[in-house]
């Protein structure tokens, strides 16, 4: 349920309303916009009398929210969320470029790529230290050593780093990471989502390869319910009957999510296609459709990359 307040509501009446709602076990999320203040109510709102609340002098409107996601819902939070990462703002009309190697292979490799992508306009460095691979025989990443190489590259370039967390046991190693990425395969790892919900750093959730919009937003809801409201959504292609490309990039998600949620939307055209020659046109299409940023795989020697060279 959401309660839309009139402009400049009486402070005493507002405090009384909030106290009454809290007595009934309702959790209140306040969103202050340019025109109105909105109270988002989470809990058993079936016990609340809409007409009684609507009759209050300070209330302009009361609406029930049917969607299961509340914190991530634009009805709760009409203004776009802007996630601050260092000097970079993600969302709110800003275009963020995250670029770097699929896998960190060496200190020299990630350092050289970091300098190159910064010179090309990137504002964040992506790189995988822990890699979820379809085959157990594929390169699995350098692990903690890879994280240290990313930190060195950050120190040399000033670029904040975004890297994937695969398991709860790895969380202590991520205390110096700027943005935690939850990969497509872990989009519904609810224990992991709960854990990052208690972290004081942004979380980027990649869409599962067969996930609906609602399932994706419910994953964001898990993180936000833990108190972490700095959530970013990343579309990386979904699985369809088409096999020419690695996945199928769902650009329709951008206007749909723009309607459903206030969270920033990043597009990953590299994983979506698996082919480097498709990255440019799909990146441009994503920006034209209204994406808040791009996640691009870059390698200084794609032919000899240990992971995903063809799409870099």
Task: Please tell me what each predicted stretch does.
Residues 6, 142, 158-169, 178-191, ...:
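Catalytic beta/alpha-barrel core
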Residues 126-144, 299-310:
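Glycine-rich, proline-tolerant flexible connector loops at the mouths of alpha/beta enzymes
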Residues 1-97:
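Non-catalytic terminal accessory/regulatory regions of metabolic enzymes
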